[in-house]
Amino acid sequence: DVYKRQLLNVGLLNIKDLLDISIEFSRVNDIPINSTEGFIRQLIGWREFIRGIYIAKGSFERTNNFWGFKSKIPKSFYDGTTGIEPLDSSIKKVSDTGYIHHIERLMIVGNFMLLCEFDPDEVYRWFMEVSIDSFDWVMVPNVYGMSQFADGGLMSTKPYISSSNYISKMSDYKKGNWSDIWDGLFWRFMDKQRSFFIKNPRLRMLVNTFDKMDINKKQRHLLTAENFLNKIHNE
């Protein structure tokens, strides 16, 4: 429940009490061990790791801008009129409820904002403004570290970016104009930041894929990306 998550993040709900209740509920209701373990791991594993990163490296993360991006977030990213269907859906959902799932935050909103080269401080502010469970200790590592890779890899070995293919596979959104724009931005990003990606064994092949791409397809991707960026940066 999102509202319990808010109480947990601010410290009004004790994590030990929640763990005790969860374990007892799992025992009484014969919940599969893998489901119980996954839930508990999020509470005392990943969640505490994020808290630890904030305490130890939060100041470093929030004052770094690895990519050097300075663009402001335009109005369309607040009212859900970007024309990018999965993104607009997530924006409208968080506007209505104050909450979107972690994967939506990371792989839809954060992913697309990184491809648009927004200032990480702007991205941090956006998430703090729209999320009911937003607190500084949660958002600093999740935005500057995971989502925008502004810390240069303190928390992860690669940025969480993808083409539209990942979004399509993980959802029921159909291909369309939005996916053409997303792919254009993705390949533009790979090309523009090739000096970084070529050194990463997990992503080097994507640079090679772009280099081997048909010249007309390559130019179409880049033109689509530039047209979209010019549009949003001139709102």
Predicted feature descriptions by range:
Residues 12-235:
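C-terminal catalytic domain of photolyase/cryptochrome flavoproteins
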Residues 2-3:
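Short, small-residue-biased leader/transition segments that mark boundaries at the very start
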